């Protein structure tokens, strides 16, 4: 299974929704709070082609996008294949 990383921040409803979706699908993930780890914000910007919104979600080095993109993958039953 690929490593899942969620770049997120506090008081973020979309971040919470993404984490609930991952938990509901029993997908382990690493949570990075970009407000605490400022260098990680620069890392997120670099990996996501400058996207500043959170969450930004990655499966290994594959940029999934934010919550809406993650939710679309779940609805289309594509999460499992992307994690292989």
Give residue spans per PLM region:
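Short glycine-rich loop/turn motifs that provide flexible caps or phosphate-binding loops at active sites
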Residues: 8, 49, 64-65
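Structural micro-motif
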Residues: 49-58, 68
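Local sequence-structure signature of Cys/Sec-based thiol-disulfide redox active-site neighborhoods
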Residues: 1-28
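Residues that form or flank phosphate/diphosphate-binding pockets in enzymes
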Residues: 16, 39, 65
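Thioredoxin-like thiol-disulfide oxidoreductase module
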Residues: 34-50
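Non-catalytic, surface beta->alpha helical segment in thiol-disulfide oxidoreductase systems
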Residues: 59-84
């Amino acid at each position: 299974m690929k490593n899942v990383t969620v770049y997120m921040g506090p008081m973020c409803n979309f971040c919470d929704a993404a984490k609930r979706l991952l938990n509901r699908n029993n997908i382990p993930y690493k949570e990075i709070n970009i407000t605490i780890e400022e260098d990680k914000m620069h890392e997120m910007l670099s990996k996501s082609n400058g996207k500043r919104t959170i969450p930004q979600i990655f499966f290994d080095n594959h940029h999934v996008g934010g919550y809406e993109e993650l939710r679309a993958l779940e609805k289309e039953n594509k999460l499992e294949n992307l994690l292989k």
